[in-house]
Amino acid sequence: TLFRSRHNFCYTSAVMREKTRKLDLKLSERFGKHPGVILWHISNEYGGNFRDASCHCEECQKAFRKWLKKKYKTLDALNHAWWSAFWSHTYTDWEQIHSPSPRGEDELHGLKLDWKRFVSEQLQDFCREEIRAVKTYSDLPVTTNMMMYFSPLDYDKWAEELDVISWDSYPSWHTKEDEVPIAVWAAFMHNQMRGFQKKPFLMMESTPSLVNWDEENNVKRPGMNYLSSMQAIALGSNSVLYFQWRKSRGSSEKFHGAVVDHDASEKNRVFQEVAWIGKDLEK
């Protein structure tokens, strides 16, 4: 199995699915009618184990071959569709097929595209099972937070499973000479989220100050968090939510922005701008 930065589990594993179902059932039974719960947030950034959302274990290899057999029926049909004879990649046995990875074939375009489709469908099915479990004792709406234009997952199909669309918005403000291209990109993403279901969505995550994954992470200039938040509202978001409430004391996201900084002060600019947005949204 090839693990990356997080989500170190197999979405095909029957054991993982059963354990997850039991946890979801307990949550549904305990909190499904609680007046303080208004929405089920399923998982967090499905597929967020970095770039390809993939697990490459033997269970996934078997499931992938089964998926391919259902789609193509015969190896001749698969070889023709992938045009695998080029560079002598013709398959003569289903067991010869493995997921594209640094440990094997990763230049066959048909293989890579079908693997992406398989991964998206497997994760969507995993999500579907979680939704079914939490709705056992509850009729609350469900969502899961999408990640911009995260290509490994087919969000158009995922939208069919969700009651509410939500996404994590992190425009790269102040990285270009002109803010307009970034603003246009952000507007496009908000419009896409609204377009999935033709109704308002939730901005599940945003940063009040800075991110932590670029080579240079710029703090939002005075007023930019306000402008960015109001842009989201104007384009269909029903929320301005932040990751994270308090800065982490360590590990990968210790420098990621938060409402409460390491100084735990209410007097700094970031906290004051968050409060400003909150007051205006109450009007």
Model features per residue range: what roles?
Residues 90, 94-97, 162-163, 170-283:
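Carbohydrate-binding surfaces of carbohydrate-active enzymes
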Residues 4-164, 168-175, 179-188:
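Polysaccharide-binding and catalytic clefts of secreted carbohydrate-active enzymes
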